[in-house]
From Swiss-Prot:
Residues 198-222 are annotated as: Disordered. InterPro entries: Beta-casein-like. This is Transmembrane protein 54. The chain crosses the membrane at residues 22-42, 62-82, 100-120, 155-175. Residues 213-222 have a biased composition (Polar residues). It is found in: Membrane. GO terms for cellular component: membrane. It comes from Bos taurus.
Length: 222
């Protein structure tokens, strides 16, 4: 008897779950670091409740941090599922957390894309609001400017681009994780069934008892 899950043996399926969980954990940590760097180097200077663009920057950064934490949690649950595969509550936990992770990462990616577009549209004026000089065409390191204005524009776009790539990757692997959890939950609603067989028995030759055995006999003489 050969047990198969989604065309893979149980051992191979556990390995796929383990690798997917590890990738989610790594992506979540890197995305969290990128969001923390963005807040520490840029957004802590431009947080202004009366500025809609700066407020949108901060909301997207908070969303990025939240998404990274959810991704890490989802990756850990996938790794645990690879060890305790028969647990039904754990399967549902992985499935629900993976779906939430995919939606949150996709929302985060759209928010980061909007931040990049608004930065290009406004030429980074919201990033330079803490400085007193007139505009980005007069960039100079002034004593009353809390950061280097010559680098904040490129640094922000670079960190936003990195975070955007990682959010897209997180959503892809979260969908993959949800697909794997969907397979072990044995849900096939489009077939009109709540469960399907994932155990396939290898065919074995069986002798028919009603089939007479033919033995060689000598010639009959009358």
């Amino acid at each position: 008897m050969c047990l198969r899950l989604g065309g893979l043996s149980v051992g191979d399926f556990r390995k796929v779950l383990m690798k997917t969980g590890l990738v989610l954990v790594v992506l979540g940590h890197v995305s969290f670091i990128a969001a923390a760097l963005l807040h520490g180097t840029v957004l802590r200077y431009v947080a202004a409740p009366n500025d809609a663009v700066a407020l949108q920057y901060c909301v997207v950064d908070i969303l990025s941090v939240t998404s990274a934490i959810v991704v890490i949690t989802s990756g850990i649950s996938v790794i645990v599922l690879s060890r305790y595969l028969p647990s039904i509550p754990l399967r549902w936990t992985v499935f629900s957390s993976s779906v939430a992770c995919a939606l949150l990462s996709l929302t985060c990616a759209l928010g980061l894309l909007a931040s990049i577009a608004m930065t290009f549209a406004t030429q980074g004026r919201a990033l330079l609001a803490a400085c007193t000089f007139g505009g980005p065409e007069r960039l100079a390191l002034a004593p009353d400017c809390p950061f280097d204005p010559t680098r904040i524009y490129s640094s922000s776009l670079c960190l936003w681009g990195i975070s955007l790539l990682f959010c897209v990757a997180e959503s892809v692997f979260a969908v993959r994780s949800a697909q794997l959890a969907y397979q072990v939950l044995e849900l096939r609603p489009w077939l009109g069934k709540s469960s399907h067989r994932m155990m396939q028995e290898s065919p074995e030759p069986v002798e028919d008892p009603d089939l007479p055995s033919r033995t060689s006999s000598g010639p009959m003489t009358l």
